[in-house]
Each structure stands twice: as structure tokens, then as C-alpha cells.
Amino acid sequence: MGFLCPGSFSEGKRSAFTLMDLETGSRIPMGDVNEQKGWVKFRRFFFNPEAFIQGELWIQSCFKKDPGLLVIDEVGPMELEGGGWAKTLDTLAQNSTVAQLWMVRQEIVQEVLRKWSIPEDQVYTAESIDNLIQRWMP
């Protein structure tokens, strides 16, 4: 359970992305390089406030169903500056009852670890995903 943010690309650069609920497949526009009415600008993207509200609802519904794994895509610079999913991550970082997989860019992993007091041994790189799978599989 949780969500991913599949992207669209234009001229080799990410130009837009949607928030997708992993349980239902439901999607909502999340970000775009083109200005959208009512959306909030952060760096080169405009973000849909409704997508953050919907994502929060999806996360809350996950906890009602006791998920085996909660996926958050992605934790990025916006969250490090207190926006985006930051408040949700504050809560999730204190929850040790649900296994969580946070997608984080390599260049900001250390900042994310510090901000949410995550131990180094909880970090898995794309190259070590087999170790992650073995950890959660019986």
C-alpha cells in the first residue's frame, strides 16, 4: 500500500507526474512544469495541493487495513524544507509497527536520515534491493 509518482518526460526531462494509489490504481495529477491555476510552485514544478490531500487520505486508509508495507514516492527537497509530505513523514518516522519504503534521491539520503532520525542500517540502495526483499520475505 502507499503511492508512487510515475512521471512524464519531454525532451529527456521530467515534465509532469501523477500520484498513484498502489492499492486501487487511482491517479491524481501531482506536478507539472507548466503553471496550473491554484497549484503551488516549488523549484521548477507546480504542485497540486489536492494531490497532497488525497495522498494523506490514502495513507490514513492504509493504517486502517494494517498494511504489510507502506510505500512513499518520493521524499525530496520539498519535504526537507518542511513542505510536501513532511508532516506525514514526521508521523510515519515515529511508527515502528508498519514496514515503510521511502524513495529518496541518493544525493539527499543523509539529510533525510538526519531529519527523521532514521538509522543508517535502514537504508537500501537500488543495488541492494535484493537484501531488502529478503529482509521482508519469510
Mark where each language-model region is:
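Short, surface-exposed linear patches
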Residues: 23-27, 39-43, 74, 92-95, ...
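Phosphate-binding/switch loop-helix module in NTP-utilizing enzymes
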Residues: 37-82, 88-90
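Low-complexity, flexible helical/coil segments
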Residues: 11, 36-42, 54-58, 104-111, ...
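Conserved beta-strand scaffold positions in the cores of enzyme catalytic domains, especially
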Residues: 2, 71, 120-123
